[in-house]
């Protein structure tokens, strides 16, 4: 009798796990988080949709900002990394550390409040590789993310250092937007150095940024499907200095994001994940 009960309990647990793993695939998307590193990247979109600041969303010790509202049938939460106060520079908190912390805290808060995110979109600017067909202003949707500057030459640590994570599949969305698809490689430096070059090639990178891999990692910890929407501001393997090209095209890229993101939300809202 005890053995039969144990088998029944085991079967019930397995069934529960299977149902839980399939919930994401079969549930409709109506609660979306959009993680954007820089204020200049986020502001046009936030203003366009009239999203409102939520000053109680993050702990007061953090520099992060949240904006909430609705677009169609979707609840939206836009989070940005805020400005640096630790080093007293006042610049945007770019890079993997603030991106991972902001994303983790966002998904944690929403999960604990029984308001779990159905999808996370990492939106922002990026460098593009001309060898992969990238041009200034192109919109890319990520197929995967990886790191190009976490070099840990110890066998078991190599895959951890690269940290490759697949994005949720968005082929239908790419066709709808006429966007390109590709891998986003992440590092904590804006410029391009030869020491990173081979790692970017190994990652099969189409675009390069400073946050995507960190945001994907935080999303994975909360089992939230994720992908990136990236607009090219500079050509990594081109002739112009990255910083000059970046600032030259940042305004145009932010406007392109403003135009693309509502279309992204319109497409994903009320769809199942396997329809993206």
Task: Describe each region flagged by the PLM.
Residues 22-23, 49, 71, 250:
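Prokaryotic Sec-type signal peptides and long signal-anchor helices
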Residues 8-24:
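Cleavable N-terminal signal peptides of Sec/SRP-targeted secreted and luminal proteins
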Residues 29-31, 59-275:
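Glycine-rich phosphate- or other oxyanion-binding loops that anchor nucleotides, phosphorylated ligands
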Residues 31-55, 64, 71-75:
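Short, conserved "active-site rim" segments that organize catalytic pockets and cofactor/ligand binding
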Residues 23-26, 52-60:
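Short linear motifs in intrinsically disordered
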């Amino acid at each position: 009798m005890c053995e039969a009960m144990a088998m029944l309990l085991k079967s019930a647990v397995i069934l529960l796990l299977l149902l839980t793993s399939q919930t994401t695939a079969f549930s409709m998307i109506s609660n979306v988080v959009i993680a954007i590193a820089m204020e200049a990247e986020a502001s046009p979109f936030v203003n366009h949709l009239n999203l409102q600041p939520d000053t109680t969303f993050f702990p007061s010790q953090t520099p992060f900002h949240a904006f909430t509202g609705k677009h169609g049938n979707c609840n939206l939460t836009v989070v940005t990394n805020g400005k640096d106060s630790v080093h007293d520079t006042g610049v945007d908190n770019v890079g993997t550390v603030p991106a991972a912390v902001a994303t983790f805290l966002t998904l944690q808060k929403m999960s604990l409040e029984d308001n779990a995110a159905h999808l996370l979109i990492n939106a922002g600017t990026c460098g593009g590789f001309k060898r992969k067909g990238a041009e200034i202003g192109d919109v890319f949707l990520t197929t995967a993310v990886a790191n190009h500057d976490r070099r840990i030459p110890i066998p078991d640590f190599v895959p951890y250092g690269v940290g490759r994570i697949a994005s949720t599949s968005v082929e239908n969305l790419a066709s709808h937007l006429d966007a390109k698809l590709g891998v986003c490689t992440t590092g904590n430096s804006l410029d391009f150095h030869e020491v990173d070059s081979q790692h970017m090639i190994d990652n099969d990178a189409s675009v390069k940024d400073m946050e995507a891999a960190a945001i994907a990692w935080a999303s994975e910890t909360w089992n939230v499907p994720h992908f990136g929407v990236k607009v090219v501001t500079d050509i990594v393997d081109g002739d112009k200095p990255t910083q000059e090209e970046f600032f030259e095209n940042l305004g145009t890229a932010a406007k392109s994001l403003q135009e693309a993101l509502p279309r992204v939300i319109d497409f994903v809202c009320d769809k199942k994940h396997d329809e993206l």
